[in-house]
Amino acid sequence: MTDVPVSRIRNFSIIAHIDHGKSTLADRLLQVTDTVQQREMKEQFLDNMDLERERGITIKLQAARMNYKAKDGQDYVLNLIDTPGHVDFSYEVSRSLAACEGALLVVDASQGVEAQTLANVYLALDNNLEIIPVLNKIDLPSAEPDRVAAEIEEVVGLDCSDIIQASAKAGIGVDDILEAIVQQVPPPADTVDQPLRALIFDSYYDAYRGVVVYFRVMDGQVKKGDKVRLMASDKEYVIDELGVLSPTQVQVEALHAGEVGYFAAAIKAVADARVGDTITMANSPAAEPLPGYTEANPMVFCGLFPIDADQYPDLKDALEKLKLNDAALSYEPETSSAMGFGFRCGFLGLLHMEIVQERLEREYNLDLITTAPSVIYRVTTTDEEVIEVDNPSLLPPIQKRLKVEEPFIKVEMITPETYVGTLMELCQSRRGVFKDMKFFTQTRTALIYELPLAEVVTDFFDQLKSRTKGYASMEYQLIGYRENPLVKLDILVNGDGVDALAMIVHRDKAYYVGRAMVSKLKELIPRHQFKVPIQAAIGAKVIASEHIPALRKDVLAKCYGGDISRKKKLLQKQAKGKKRMKAIGTVDVPQEAFMAVLKLDPQ
C-alpha cells in the first residue's frame, strides 16, 4: 500500500485551449515538486509523441504523481491527469475529468477564453469538479490580466477575485497553484472498504507487456496478482504488474481508493481495455459499473490507398498496429477501379484523421493517397429498409431511395467581433442555420450555428482560421440526422466513372460543385493522344463537362502544296487511328486530381 491516507490525495487535471501553456505548466509542477530530476527535464515532458511536440498539442492522455509538502507541513500526493485539448478527443477528456475531483482552468492572459476551453469547462462542471482559474503568460507585454479575469467571470461564471496570476515559462505563481490545489480541490471519497471499482482513462500498447492500462481507483483496493474483470468488454485478466506514474512507471504492490496508477495484464489489444470501462474483481464484482461509458463512434470516413500497390501488406500491418493503440480508429478493406486495393477508415474527426495519416506516413514510411472525407448518411430504401452509407460509391440508385438523411452538428465559434460578418458568410455558404449569437465582452462574440457535418469535414476549419487571421476557435457536437435532398455526383473521365472522385452533395449545390470539379480536373489531367471528355453527372444526366484536346502530330508537314485529296487521306487516316486509340486507351489520372477534391471552392 502507498502510505498516504485518502484525505491527503488530490486528483486534478488541467483544462486549457491549444497553446495556452498547459504542457509548460505541467513541466513546472513536475519540477517544483522534484518529481522529475533537473537533468532529465525536457520541454513538454508529458507530450511523448514526436507529433505532439511538433504540433504542440496533446493527443494521448498522460498522468503524473507528485509528492508535495504543503505549507501546513503535511505531505500530499497530487495526481495530475493531463487531457487532450482538441474537440475530436472530447470523449477522452470527459473520462479523464471523471477521474478527478478538481481542475485548473488555464487561460492565456493575452488571449482570453476560447471555444474548446469552454466546452471542457462545461464537461468539468457536469462532473462536479472544483475549478481553480489560473491566468497564464502574465509576463507577456500584451497580457491584460484584468480584462481576461473579467471575461472568465462573465463567460464561465467563476469567481475570479483571487485568481492566480502565473507564468509557467518564467516559473511565476507555481507555488500558489500547488497550494490552491491542496486547499481547494476536495479529497477523494474514502471508500476503501467497498468492492473494487476503477475507471480506465487511458491505455496504450506496449510491444513487450501487451496493453498498459491507466486507471483511477474509485472504490476498494487492488493488489498485484488480483484477478480482475473489465465490465464493458467482460474479459478477465490477472494483474502482472501494478504501479504509479511519477511520470515514469514505478511498481507498487497495491493501490486503494482515490489513487491513480497503471497495470499490465497481458491484454492483447487496446479495444479490450476501452477508455471509460470499469475494472472490478472477478470473484466479487461490483453491482454496477461506473456511469458514462460509451463506445467511441467514428464520424468521418475516407479511403486510404498506397501509391505503390506493393505497399498494401505494409499498410495493413501499420493499421493493425495503430489500432492496438487507438481504439477509435476503424478500417475495412476496399477496392477501387481507379486506385486498386486499400482501406476505408473511420475517424473521430478531422484532426484525428490527419494525425493517423501523418503517423502512417512518418512511422511506417508509407506513401498514401487519401480520398475526400465523407460522413455516414442514413438512406431509407423503397423497401423501407434503413442502411448506413459511408462511401458515396455505395449509395443506392435514385430509383431505390426514398430519402437520404445526413448528420448535423451544432458549432460554437468564439471570435473577435470584427470577424463576425465573414464567419456568418462562411456558415451561410455551407448550408448553416443561424441559431444564436452571444456577446461576451466588448470585443468577443460567440456564434452558434447548426451545420451539416459533411460541409465541415473538408476545409471548414482552415477557412475559419484564415478568415479570422487565426483568432477564432470552434467546438462542435453531433445533434442528430436530418433529411435533405442529397444526390450522388459522379465524375466520368473518358466515359468511365472514377469511384474515388464520386461525392454526395446537396441538389442545389450539385451544378456548382460539378462545374468546379471538371474545370479543376481539366487543369490537372495531362493531355493524351486522343480527346478526353470529363463529365459530372447525376445518374444519367450530365450537368457539366469539359474536354481535354488531343495531342496531335502535324501529318501534313511533308505535303508541300500537292493535291487536297492527298491531305484528306492523311487526315482521315490520323482520325481513324485516334478513334481506335480512344476506344482502347486508358486515361492516367494523377494523384493531385484526387487531392484537388479536398480544396474545391465551388463559387
UniProtKB/Swiss-Prot annotation:
Recorded GO MF terms: GTP binding; GTPase activity; ribosome binding
SUPFAM superfamilies (alphabetical): EF-G C-terminal domain-like (SSF54980), P-loop containing nucleoside triphosphate hydrolases (SSF52540)
CC annotations in GO: plasma membrane
Protein name as it appears in the record: Elongation factor 4
Function description: Required for accurate and efficient protein synthesis under certain stress conditions. May act as a fidelity factor of the translation reaction, by catalyzing a one-codon backward translocation of tRNAs on improperly translocated ribosomes. Back-translocation proceeds from a post-translocation (POST) complex to a pre-translocation (PRE) complex, thus giving elongation factor G a second chance to translocate the tRNAs correctly. Binds to ribosomes in a GTP-dependent manner.
Substrates-to-products reaction catalysed: GTP + H2O = GDP + phosphate + H(+)
Subcellular locations according to the entry: Cell inner membrane
UniProt similarity note: Belongs to the TRAFAC class translation factor GTPase superfamily. Classic translation factor GTPase family. LepA subfamily.
Enzyme nomenclature, EC number: 3.6.5.n1
Protein keywords: Cell inner membrane, Cell membrane, GTP-binding, Hydrolase, Membrane, Nucleotide-binding, Protein biosynthesis
Enzyme category, top tier: hydrolase
NCBIfam families per record: lepA, small_GTP
